[in-house]
């Protein structure tokens, strides 16, 4: 405890929030955690901690009485949390990650009270980062432990009730964690202090934790409420560019994914591209996550495919996208359907299945383009003039290509419907002359963006 109090004193004198946050970390060597736990007992912990904090700040500007009490409550809660954490780490009998979570939640509540009414200053907000981040980790551990116990038939911790639904409590602690993080979000957002000493500087870290939590709970839509609230307060906020790049990247990634899930692909591409450009060159996992959504976005917004060079550093993305890309490029409809089917589980898991399914339109466009090119040229109507591509294509030729490509026999009406859809989506320029059984294509740019 003496070592911890000394670090607290140094952090207070230098106003170093990150050094202060390390005194609340559970990620210390077990030997160090054990030493903190054994430094006092239940009967004297409160007095030992309070006396240590009072004495530690006597050499410089003394902390106000309320703030001393606030930090004493925080470190008492931390000491109690260590008492639950050590048995859980050692898998001792009667230990429980639920107990760890509940004790750590008390630590976060003590910090919250410190900022609300005991004078904690904004420079110390990294303490919120460390405690909030680990609250989420302990929530995941507690839910995992509980679900494993239920699967093993141990229901001793459950209250028996007729309508008990095991699935409703699978993420019980993580859902509670989301509520605690929301309190911290509001704590930062509603700070009315001048910006240079405002808790608003902690808001994007907490927002990013909330995004991760909501996505883990499969409640991504709740993230939109955060964005709406943030938008309403944006005039009172520091610009995003003033925050650490790591926080900018994470925020832009989730903002892009949310737009992606709402099928707002142009905005999604904009946010994801910003995240990609800000991402550190060696953060390969983060870049892979960004590309998971940026590649399908780009496919729909620009009708272009990822290059082999782009995907080369990411074997998992190659496995995901290259089979589909090859089928789209060659206009192979049946092979595209098979590749989509084979990767369905992974695509659904990553929430990109429906978007990639639309890539079939690009494959169909490339197939129809082949028919157009194979049609060759017509002699110019002007003597000596250059030959021009045949632009009046019989529907039957397109029908034959589509039937061969998809390995399905389609009726003429279905073919015409597909063609009309391509024209409507501006993947092909022209019109259908039904009476004559022709598709009349534009003489300039029959297939926009393809150079034909």
Curated annotation (Swiss-Prot):
Matching InterPro entries: Csn12-like (IPR045114), PCI_dom (IPR000717), WH-like_DNA-bd_sf (IPR036388)
Annotated disulfide bonds: none
Pfam family, one: PCI
Entry GO MF terms: double-stranded DNA binding; RNA binding
PCI domain segment(s): 249-446
PANTHER family linked: PCI DOMAIN-CONTAINING PROTEIN 2, UNCHARACTERIZED PROTEASOME COMPONENT REGION PCI-CONTAINING
Family: Belongs to the CSN12 family.
The protein's name in its UniProt record: Protein CSN12 homolog
Species the sequence originates in: Neurospora crassa (strain ATCC 24698 / 74-OR23-1A / CBS 708.71 / DSM 1257 / FGSC 987)
Lineage: Eukaryota, Fungi, Dikarya, Ascomycota, Pezizomycotina
Gene: csn-8
């Amino acid at each position: 405890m003496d070592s911890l109090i000394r670090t607290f004193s140094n952090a207070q004198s230098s106003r170093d929030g990150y050094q202060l946050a390390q005194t609340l970390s559970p990620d210390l060597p077990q030997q160090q955690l054990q030493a903190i736990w054994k430094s006092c007992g239940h009967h004297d912990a409160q007095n030992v901690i309070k006396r240590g904090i009072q004495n530690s700040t006597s050499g410089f500007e003394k902390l106000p009485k309320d703030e001393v009490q606030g930090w004493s409550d925080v470190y008492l809660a931390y000491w109690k949390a260590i008492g639950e954490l050590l048995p859980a780490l050692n898998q001792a009998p009667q230990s429980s990650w639920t107990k760890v979570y509940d004790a750590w939640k008390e630590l976060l509540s003590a910090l919250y009270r410190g900022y609300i009414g005991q004078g904690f200053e904004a420079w110390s907000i990294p303490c919120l980062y460390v405690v909030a981040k680990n609250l989420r980790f302990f929530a995941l551990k507690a839910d995992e432990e509980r679900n494993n116990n239920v699967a093993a038939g141990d229901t001793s911790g459950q209250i028996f009730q007729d309508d008990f639904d095991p699935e409703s409590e699978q993420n019980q602690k993580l859902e509670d964690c989301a509520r605690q993080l929301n309190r911290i979000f509001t704590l930062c957002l509603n700070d009315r202090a001048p910006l240079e000493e405002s808790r608003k500087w902690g808001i994007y870290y907490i927002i990013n934790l909330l995004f991760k939590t909501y996505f883990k709970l499969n409640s991504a839509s709740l993230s939109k409420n955060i964005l709406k609230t943030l938008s309403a307060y944006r005039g009172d906020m520091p610009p995003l560019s003033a925050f650490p790049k790591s926080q900018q990247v994470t925020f832009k990634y989730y903002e892009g994914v949310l737009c992606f899930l709402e099928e707002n692909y142009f905005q999604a591409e904009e946010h994801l591209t910003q995240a990609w450009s800000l991402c550190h060159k060696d953060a390969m996992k983060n870049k892979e996550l960004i590309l998971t959504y940026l590649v399908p976005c780009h496919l729909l917004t620009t009708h272009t495919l990822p290059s082999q060079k782009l995907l080369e550093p990411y074997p998992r993305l190659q496995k995901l996208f290259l089979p589909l890309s090859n089928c789209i490029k060659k206009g192979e409809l049946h092979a595209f359907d098979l590749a989509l089917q084979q990767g369905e589980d992974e695509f659904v898991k990553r929430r990109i299945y429906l978007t990639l399914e639309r890539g079939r339109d690009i494959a169909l466009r490339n197939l129809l383009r082949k028919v157009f090119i194979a049609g060759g040229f017509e002699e110019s109507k002007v003597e000596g003039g250059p030959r021009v591509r045949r632009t009046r294509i019989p529907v039957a030729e397109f029908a034959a290509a589509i039937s061969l490509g998809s390995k399905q026999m389609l009726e003429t009406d279905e073919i015409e419907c597909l063609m009309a859809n391509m024209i409507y989506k501006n993947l092909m320029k022209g019109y259908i002359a039904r009476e004559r059984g022709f598709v009349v294509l534009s003489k300039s740019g029959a297939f926009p963006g393809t150079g034909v």
